[in-house]
């Protein structure tokens, strides 16, 4: 009398594994673990375990904990009525140089947390705000202090240019 072993299928990997990860291209198989292999027929959970091992993480180009996105409705609350200097990046989703400025603004938001507020505004979604501040080219970064525009920087420039303007704005507000 032969004992038959029934293997319980392995539970699927938790959904948290799939956040920010990329799976390998379909159609590629590893010997012994394909759908038609005898191992897959005998132990159905085997394939799932193998797929979980194939998951690779994707490194993020920049940290998502940077500048927050604002809207035209929240403009007065976050920019005009702010008691500390505010940096606003005007950008558009189709603009390549804007992505480079995103990284700089995100770094500045983390480095100057508490001393300056950093926000992003999509000019395609809110053109009325862009036209009211004469934004004709993007990326454009504006610095506000006490509700008034103090600096305007247009184009993709080194981080030192933005930091210099911020330091000047912060030193003016402390005096």
UniProtKB/Swiss-Prot annotation:
Keywords, ordered alphabetically: Chloroplast, Disulfide bond, Electron transport, Plastid, Redox-active center, Transit peptide, Transport
Transit peptide: 1-59
Pfam family, one: Thioredoxin
Family: Belongs to the thioredoxin family. Plant M-type subfamily.
Catalytic residues in the record: 95, 98
Subcellular location: Plastid, Chloroplast
Annotated S-S bridges: 95-98
Function description: Probable thiol-disulfide oxidoreductase that may be involved in the redox regulation of chloroplastic enzymes.
Protein name: Thioredoxin M3, chloroplastic
Domain of life, source organism: Eukaryota
GO cellular component: chloroplast; cytoplasm
Swiss-Prot/TrEMBL site (Contributes to redox potential value) positions: 96-97
Molecular-function annotations in GO: protein-disulfide reductase activity
Positions of the Thioredoxin domain: 61-171
């Amino acid at each position: 009398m032969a004992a038959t072993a029934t293997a319980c299928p392995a539970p699927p990997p938790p959904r948290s594994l799939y956040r920010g990860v990329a799976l390998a291209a379909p159609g590629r198989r590893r010997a012994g673990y394909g759908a038609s292999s005898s191992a897959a027929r005998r132990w159905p959970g085997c394939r799932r375990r193998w797929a979980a091992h194939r998951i690779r993480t994707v490194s993020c180009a920049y940290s998502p904990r940077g500048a927050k996105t604002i809207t035209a409705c929240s403009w007065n609350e976050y920019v005009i009525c702010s008691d500390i200097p505010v940096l606003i990046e005007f950008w558009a989703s189709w603009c390549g140089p804007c992505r480079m400025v995103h990284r700089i603004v995100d770094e500045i938001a983390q480095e100057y947390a508490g001393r300056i507020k950093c926000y992003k505004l999509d000019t395609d979604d809110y053109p009325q705000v862009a036209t009211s501040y004469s934004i004709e080219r993007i990326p454009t970064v504006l610095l506000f202090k006490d509700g008034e525009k103090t600096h305007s920087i247009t184009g993709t420039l080194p981080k030192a240019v933005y930091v210099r303007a911020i330091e000047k704005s912060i030193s003016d507000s402390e005096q």
